Amino acid sequence: MNDVPNLFGSMVFNDTVMQARLPKDSYKALKKAILQGAHLELDVANVVANAMKDWAVEKGATHFTHWFQPMTGITAEKHDSFISPAGDGTIIMEFSGKELVRGEPDASSFPSGGLRATFEARGYTVWDITSYAFIKDGTLCIPTAFCSYSGEALDKKTPLLRSMETLNQQALRILKLFGNTKTQRVITTVGPEQEYFLIDKQSYLKRPDLLYTGRTLFGARPPKGQELDDHYFGALKPRVSAFMKELDEELWKLGVHAKTKHNEVAPAQHELAPVFSTTNIATDHNQITMELMKSIADKHDLACLLHEKPFAGVNGSGKHNNWSLSTDDGANLLEPGETPYENAQFLLFLVAVVKAVDEYQDLLRVSVANAGNDHRLGANEAPPAIVSMFLGDELTEILEAIESGADYHNREKLQMEIGVTVLPHFFKDTTDRNRTSPFAFTGNKFEFRMVGSTFSISGPNIVLNTVVAESLALFADRLETASDFQSELAALIQETICAHKRIIFNGNNYADEWMQEAAQRGLSNLRTTVEALPAFISPKSMALFTKHHVFTDTEIHSRYEIFMESYCKTLHIEALTMVDMAKKYIIPACLSYENELAELLLRKKSCGDFDCSLEEYLLDKIASLSGYMLGKLTELELALITSKQEQETEPLARFYRDSVFARMSELRFTVDELETLVAKKHWPMPTYADMLYSAN
């Protein structure tokens, strides 16, 4: 495979294909609908559908599906064939504009947070014309939004599109104030860096916890973890390299701009990073990426683990959300330029983000909250649960100068001195990077690093788009009525810096001292999902989302219920899995080894006066720990029984966090210690050492 340009997008009904296959008037009408949000007439939809069907059939497709993203966090699809009876015992291949534009899946079988009852089954999928259709496994996949019969959004795409629209509207107001009348649309762009683990498939299949929950619920640390930092950017192992090569090719066929691949910090951990694209398209592409990672890994006798913390004791996996603002004519609104201190438009957009992150830090925390990410955030491997911003030395100095009214002296670009004459000379950047920051400015974009690896990026970007839109709306309200635009602009930037500078922190976010300082600054520290989620239904949050028409009140409350229920169900499944594994695997293994030790001890004693201290020690230690394990297992089972008595979602979630998870941790500690004592031939499942070094 060398012809990447021809391979790229070959399974996508993209703009090039549309131009070649659609009549000019139909193509123009479709492009107008895509670029300007104009209504697409049914006769045009019929033409597009027929062209799409012909193209798909030529590519080997036999079915089509409305591909949507319900509140499960993964994609959903129902496959219908193109065939239609011809009346003479034959068939024809048909696909109408109505079938393209709208579908009717069962809305009661997906999470709805009470929006849909079992008897209220009707839901609609609606074509997202801004995201290209593509062919996957012989099926034409049409990206769609998903709503209920009464119009409520039941998916992650609909509110994302709404948030992009409100940000577009408010950003255009700001640009017009600066005299820009050419820009017709402002879009948000995202490049999500996807981290994941690869282990041998046979090891995976022998671990019930990985099969049921995506993470290991038991497992002692191996002798070697990530201490030597020798896995990060290391040479790719042959099987991993073959997997990555096929993944690249399949992603390129589907128009995904897969760009960078490398080993990550933890053993068996890797990363794939794409080029930026429009946020809703980037969201679709990331869902495709995660799906293909799993299916292609399986073909290579590997298992792809996307959980935020599949292995204790080594780094977990995140998904850095690189977010920026661009115009339809190619300008990046977060590009500082050569002289950022003189770039008033950039500074206004910058402080709008600063204001948004400070005022809605709790909502940003909500957007990355789930049971899996609770294991990762604040664990000295990922940003803490405290939201702060890194701007770097240069921008921080500029903002400090504006705040104080002092003159700013531009930083000189320094040439990098390496001390080797044969190496090329280059200028160093004006600021370093801070990998511990949850929300960092990295040149011409913001990198939101708190997002978990399993997440759809729609949630974090819905919040980010909406809170920035709110800042821009307030700025526009003030500047549009100003008698002197320039003086009002200067005052607004200065006031915003003074009011929100507490959110800026360029230091070490892992340090204990930062937690104390953050508390003094008044920043929130919502350590767990259960602490964070109530902020989603606060009056302030609800007013924000309804003002910008991103969510209705009922949609907000339904999502809150879904998030809380998901947290409870996740911990419930994990706890049941631990109980099952302890009873069916761990206890029999311990008894088997105890029996072997007891028989050996009896034989040695019957043969003479031999030293039996080792056997006696092991037998006593394992028997003692086994008894203690039984006690902790019983406590966990009792906690699960008690959980059934609580009917309200929020108290139930607190019970799972405080009682069930605590019992799970105690049981795990005991089992992990037993693993270090029981002979390997008796231990019933692959260990961390077996799994983390299995994908060679």
Which residues does each predicted region cover?
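C-terminal amphipathic alpha-helical interaction region
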Residues: 498-696
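Gly-rich Lys/Arg/Thr-decorated short loops/hinges at beta-loop-alpha junctions or inter-strand turns
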Residues: 1-14, 33-35, 223-232
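Active-site proximal loops enriched in glycine and acidic residues that flank catalytic Cys/His/Asp
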Residues: 44, 68, 96, 274, ...
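Catalytic pocket of metal/acid-base enzymes, prominently hydrolases
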Residues: 1-27, 41, 122-142, 442, ...
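Active-site-proximal loop/turn and secondary-structure-junction residues that shape catalytic pockets
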Residues: 44-48, 68-70, 98-99, 146, ...
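Active-site core of metal-dependent hydrolases
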Residues: 7-120
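Short linear, low-complexity motifs centered on an aromatic residue
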Residues: 73-89, 105-108, 113, 207, ...
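Glycine-rich, acidic/polar active-site loops that bind/position phosphate-bearing ligands
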Residues: 120-306, 315-318, 325-561
